[in-house]
Regions:
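Alpha-solenoid helical repeat scaffolds
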Residues: 1-217
C-alpha cells in the first residue's frame, strides 16, 4: 500500500491516495498519521465534508488532540467558514490558554478577519510565552506601524534587532523599508546607530550593515 501511495503522490492523485489511507485506517485504527494524511488528501480535493468525517472518525477511535483540532479548524477555513474555524480554536484556547499552536492559529484567523487589535493581543500572549517568536515580533511591528503607536512600535523594533530568531534577511528588509521613507528615518533616528552596531556584532561578515551605518553617519 505504501508503494502505491508513493506512486499516486508523484502524480498528485489525491483521490487514490485518500482511498489507500482509508484502507490503512481499517488495518490500524489507532495510527494518527493515517487519519491526518487522509484528511489532507480530501482537503486538497476540496472535499471538506469527507475531511470532517475522517476527523470525527479519528476523534472517536483515538480521542481529540491538538493536531486534529487545528486540522478541523483548517478544514473550515479552507471552506471559507472562518467564523466556525475561529470558534473551534477559541474553544480549544479557553481549555488550554498557553498552547502556542492554538495561539498561532488564533492570530492567523484574526488577521484573516482584519481584526488587527485582537491579533496583536494574541501576539502579545505569544511573546509572553516565547519572547523571541519571530512571527509574533514581525507581525506586531507591522500592526503597531499601521496603528501609529510609536512607543510600542519602537519597543518591538528594538526587540527584533536584539533577537537571534529574526533572520538577517528580515532585519535587512526592515532597514530598507525605513531608509526608503524620510519620515521613518526621522522616527527611528535615535535608534538606527544602536541597531546597526548590534547587527555588525551579530553578523560581522555582512557588508550591508557597514555600508548603511557609514551612509547614515
Amino acid at each position: 500500500l505504501y508503494a502505491l501511495i508513493e506512486l499516486y503522490a508523484k502524480t498528485y492523485d489525491f483521490d487514490k491516495q485518500a482511498e489507500l489511507w482509508e484502507d490503512l485506517i481499517q488495518i490500524d485504527k489507532l495510527n494518527n498519521m493515517y487519519y491526518i494524511e487522509a484528511i489532507y488528501c480530501y482537503m486538497n480535493l476540496g472535499l471538506f465534508k469527507k475531511a470532517l468525517k475522517i476527523v470525527q472518525k479519528a476523534e472517536k477511535n483515538i480521542a481529540k488532540n491538538e493536531n486534529l483540532t487545528i486540522l478541523k479548524s483548517e478544514i473550515y477555513q479552507r471552506d471559507n467558514k472562518i467564523e466556525r474555524s475561529l470558534e473551534i480554536i477559541l474553544n480549544a484556547h479557553k481549555k488550554n490558554p498557553n498552547n502556542l499552536n492554538y495561539l498561532k492559529k488564533l492570530s492567523e484567523l484574526y488577521i484573516l478577519k482584519s481584526e488587527y487589535i485582537l491579533a496583536n493581543e494574541v501576539y502579545t500572549k505569544i511573546l509572553d510565552i516565547e519572547p523571541e517568536n519571530p512571527t509574533a515580533l514581525l507581525a506586531s511591528f507591522k500592526i503597531f506601524q499601521t496603528q501609529s503607536l510609536l512607543d510600542q512600535e519602537i519597543d518591538v523594533f528594538l526587540k527584533i534587532f536584539n533577537s537571534i530568531s529574526v533572520t538577517k534577511e528580515q532585519k535587512i528588509d526592515i532597514l530598507f523599508e525605513i531608509f526608503s521613507d524620510n519620515n521613518k528615518i526621522e522616527r527611528y533616528k535615535n535608534h538606527i546607530p544602536t541597531v546597526l552596531d548590534k547587527c555588525i556584532l551579530t553578523y560581522p561578515d555582512e557588508v550591508m550593515f557597514y555600508v548603511v551605518l557609514g551612509d547614515y553617519k
